Amino acid sequence: MSRRGTVEEKTAKSDPIYRNRLVNMLVNRILKHGKKSLAYQILYRAVKKIQQKTETNPLSVLRQAIRGVTPDIAVKARRVGGSTHQVPIEIGSTQGKALAIRWLLGAARKRPGRNMAFKLSSELVDAAKGSGDAVRKKEETHRMAEANRAFAHFR
């Protein structure tokens, strides 16, 4: 038996204004070069823009967008007998949220527009409505998993 202690899983902290873990996860993914205050500014501006566009609670729009982009299943490359197969695997809720946030930010960065806050707010509103690049990415992932269903037994 090992003498090493067990490590407790870290829980995501909540942000200072909205007291929301999802907001904090999003800020940590926006973060570049350790400039966290800038990441907070970008997200809070985006939230303000969402409030102006939709005239509803921006946090509910954020939750709806992330829920709409979160994948249930993904494909993972696995080598079997010299050939690589795309094996569909189920994704847990935490990993799914992390993927959804990554896809939302990637889609927002690709968008044309003035600044990141504007692009992020547009992408979040689109994702909440069920359109946008991030939702397309999720559907594409699900299609890939469905197409490679025959390899599910390689898990």
From Swiss-Prot:
Keyword Glycoprotein belongs to the record: no
GO BP terms in the entry: ribosomal small subunit assembly; translation
GO terms assigned for molecular function: mRNA binding; rRNA binding; structural constituent of ribosome
Chief location category: plastid
GO CC terms, sorted: chloroplast; ribosome; small ribosomal subunit
InterPro entries cross-referenced by the UniProt entry: Ribosomal_uS7, Ribosomal_uS7_bac/org-type, Ribosomal_uS7_CS, Ribosomal_uS7_dom, Ribosomal_uS7_dom_sf
UniProt-annotated location(s): Plastid, Chloroplast
Domain of life (superkingdom): Eukaryota
SUPFAM superfamilies per the UniProt record, alphabetical: Ribosomal protein S7 (SSF47973)
Keyword vocabulary terms for this entry: Chloroplast, Plastid, Ribonucleoprotein, Ribosomal protein, RNA-binding, rRNA-binding
Ribosomal protein is among the record's keywords: yes
Subunit structure: Component of the chloroplast small ribosomal subunit (SSU). Mature 70S chloroplast ribosomes of higher plants consist of a small (30S) and a large (50S) subunit. The 30S small subunit contains 1 molecule of ribosomal RNA (16S rRNA) and 24 different proteins. The 50S large subunit contains 3 rRNA molecules (23S, 5S and 4.5S rRNA) and 33 different proteins.
Protein family membership: Belongs to the universal ribosomal protein uS7 family.
Function, as annotated: Component of the chloroplast ribosome (chloro-ribosome), a dedicated translation machinery responsible for the synthesis of chloroplast genome-encoded proteins, including proteins of the transcription and translation machinery and components of the photosynthetic apparatus.
Protein name stated in the entry: Small ribosomal subunit protein uS7cz/uS7cy
Species this protein is from: Spinacia oleracea (Spinach)
Higher taxonomy: Eukaryota, Viridiplantae, Streptophyta, Embryophyta, Tracheophyta
